[in-house]
C-alpha cells in the first residue's frame, strides 16, 4: 500500500461554520499498527484546522513548517499555503515527503500537495486520502439534502468512508471553527 493514501480526512463548510475531521487508523502495509492516531490539529492560535493523509513523520514535519508559514503571514491561509508549496517543491528534503494536507480557516478551505498544488475545492468540501472519495460523495449528498451542521456531516461521512475503505476506521477526531454572529447595533 502506498502510505500516501492510507486515511480519510474531510472538511465541510456550511454557513458560518467549518468542520475538519479524520479517522485514526495508521497502517504499515496491510497491518493496522494504531487505531487512534490524531491526524487533525488546530494551528495558528486555534484559528486554522489542518489534517493530513500520508506518512506520519512527514505530516508532522509539514504541520510544523505550515505553522511557521502561518506565523510569517499572520494567519493568512492562502499566502501561507502558497509559501509552503514553494518550499515543498524546491527543497531537496521536503520534496521527498509523502503527504497531503487539508486545511481550513473561517473563510477558506484548501488542499495542499507536494506537487505544488494549492486547491480550493468546490462546494466547501475538502477530502483527501484513500477514503476521501467516499467521504466526499457522502458529504455532498448530506450538504444538498439535509440541514445537518458541518460537524455532523463530517462524522456521518467519515462513518460511511470507514465502512467502505479498508484503510479508514471508525475512530474519529473532528474539530470545528464557528464564526460568531456579527453584533447588530
Curated annotation (Swiss-Prot):
Its main location: cytoplasm. It catalyses: ATP-dependent cleavage of peptide bonds with broad specificity. It is found in: Cytoplasm. Keywords: Allosteric enzyme, Cytoplasm, Hydrolase, Metal-binding, Protease, Sodium, Stress response, Threonine protease. GO terms for biological process: proteolysis involved in protein catabolic process. Na(+) binds at residues 162, 165, 168. SUPFAM superfamilies: N-terminal nucleophile aminohydrolases (Ntn hydrolases). A double ring-shaped homohexamer of HslV is capped on each side by a ring-shaped HslU homohexamer. The assembly of the HslU/HslV complex is dependent on binding of ATP. This is ATP-dependent protease subunit HslV. It comes from Methylibium petroleiphilum (strain ATCC BAA-1232 / LMG 22953 / PM1).
Amino acid at each position: 500500500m502506498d502510505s500516501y493514501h492510507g486515511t480519510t480526512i474531510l472538511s465541510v463548510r456550511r454557513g458560518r461554520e467549518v468542520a475538519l475531521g479524520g479517522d485514526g487508523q495508521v497502517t504499515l502495509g496491510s497491518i493496522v499498527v494504531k487505531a487512534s492516531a490524531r491526524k487533525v490539529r488546530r494551528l495558528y492560535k486555534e484559528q486554522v484546522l489542518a489534517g493530513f493523509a500520508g506518512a506520519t513523520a512527514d505530516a508532522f514535519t509539514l504541520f510544523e513548517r505550515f505553522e511557521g508559514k502561518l506565523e510569517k503571514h499572520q494567519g493568512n491561509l492562502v499566502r501561507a499555503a502558497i509559501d509552503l508549496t514553494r518550499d515543498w517543491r524546491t527543497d531537496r528534503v521536503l520534496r521527498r515527503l509523502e503527504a497531503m494536507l487539508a486545511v481550513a480557516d473561517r473563510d477558506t478551505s484548501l488542499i495542499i500537495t507536494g506537487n505544488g498544488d494549492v486547491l480550493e475545492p468546490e462546494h466547501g468540501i475538502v477530502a483527501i486520502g484513500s477514503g476521501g472519495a467516499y467521504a466526499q460523495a457522502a458529504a455532498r449528498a448530506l450538504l444538498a439534502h439535509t440541514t445537518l451542521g458541518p460537524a455532523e456531516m463530517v462524522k456521518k461521512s467519515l462513518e460511511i468512508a470507514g465502512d467502505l475503505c479498508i484503510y479508514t476506521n471508525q475512530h474519529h477526531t473532528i474539530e470545528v471553527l464557528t464564526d460568531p454572529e456579527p453584533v447588530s447595533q
